[in-house]
Amino acid sequence: MSLFKGSGVALITPFKDEESVDFETLGRLVDFHLEHKTDAIIVCGTTGEPSTMPDDEHLEVIRFVIDRVAGRKPVIAGVGSNHTKHAVYLSKKAQELGADGLLHVTPYYNKTTQKGLIEHFKEINDAVSIPIIVYNVPSRTGLNVLPETMKELAKLPNVKAIKEASGNITQVAEIAMLCPEIDIYSGNDDQIVPILSVGGIGVISVLANILPDETHDIVEYFLNGEIEKARELQLKLLPIIKALFIEVNPIPVKEAMNMMGFNVGKPRLPLTTMTEKNREILKKALVDYGISVKE
């Protein structure tokens, strides 16, 4: 059984001016997604900035979101690390907190080989009993999960899915061919329809932070056979998607949410606020779509 079909929001983490987590705003964001069409909540994925959180804060954010959701939608915890024992520790803690699944980015910086990648996930698999989503994002990690490697990972009983953000549709198709038992989620908002077309069942989305219903609708249209509607909506959203990645994620999406009145604060250093030029491009994309923004 799939963790979810449709749109899983890669939830941002709001911060106060002194950079502590703004749990009051975080609660409102969770409620926003519970009230809209978001199908799953991914907490402390890349967009949630876990790389600048100590473990106690990281786990407290996960706990807070799980408790706030209270079983109404699946909560998937981002607990990846380039240190296998650390990844195991975070995975066990997230499972204890009640996470429905785990999102694991591949090891980064030290990178490893494909063999090391398999051994890394074996250790994690053996430590937990909830579904694991492998997160392949070579642009950030310097490591690509090859289709043949994913075939080996699919033999692990808790590895159930892959978030594919390689940008390589041929590779995604090969994974779908070699691993029919594995659920595939697009990791790129501009490739939702292409990945659905080769067997994907959803997206783990930055866009869903600001347009949860539309992001869900792309997937629902496609899976219901309304391919043209899905295609049209994917293309209609493309200017906003491009603007959301005009600088490193999550800088633009946080700026967009602030423009929309969510008051989520700034990202933590080393991420900075947007340049004024790019901010105006983002603002125009939002306004052109019909989103009300603060001046």
UniProtKB/Swiss-Prot annotation:
| UniProt EC number | 4.3.3.7
Q: Which reaction does it catalyse?
A: L-aspartate 4-semialdehyde + pyruvate = (2S,4S)-4-hydroxy-2,3,4,5-tetrahydrodipicolinate + H2O + H(+)
**One Gene Ontology cellular component annotation held by this UniProt entry:** cytosol
Residues annotated as site: Part of a proton relay during catalysis: 46, 109
Annotated GO MF terms? 4-hydroxy-tetrahydrodipicolinate synthase activity
**Where, by residue number, does pyruvate bind?**
47, 204
- Which residues does UniProt mark as catalytic? 135 (proton donor/acceptor), 163 (schiff-base intermediate with substrate)
Q: What is any one GO biological process for this UniProt entry?
A: diaminopimelate biosynthetic process
Which subcellular locations apply to this protein? Cytoplasm
The keyword Cytoplasm belongs to this UniProt entry's keyword annotation:
yes
- Residues crossing the lipid bilayer are none
The pathway this protein participates in, as annotated, is: Amino-acid biosynthesis; L-lysine biosynthesis via DAP pathway; (S)-tetrahydrodipicolinate from L-aspartate: step 3/4
Alphabetized UniProt keyword annotations = Amino-acid biosynthesis, Cytoplasm, Diaminopimelate biosynthesis, Lyase, Lysine biosynthesis, Schiff base
Top EC class per UniProt?
A: lyase
Which InterPro entries does the protein's record reference?
Answer: Aldolase_TIM, DapA, DapA-like, Schiff_base-form_aldolases_AS
Q: Which HAMAP family match?
A: DapA
The UniProt subunit note reads as follows:
Homotetramer; dimer of dimers.
Similarity field: Belongs to the DapA family.
PANTHER family (alphabetical): 4-HYDROXY-2-OXOGLUTARATE ALDOLASE, MITOCHONDRIAL, DIHYDRODIPICOLINATE SYNTHASE
Function recorded in the entry: Catalyzes the condensation of (S)-aspartate-beta-semialdehyde [(S)-ASA] and pyruvate to 4-hydroxy-tetrahydrodipicolinate (HTPA).
Report what the protein is called. 4-hydroxy-tetrahydrodipicolinate synthase
Gene name, Swiss-Prot/TrEMBL: dapA
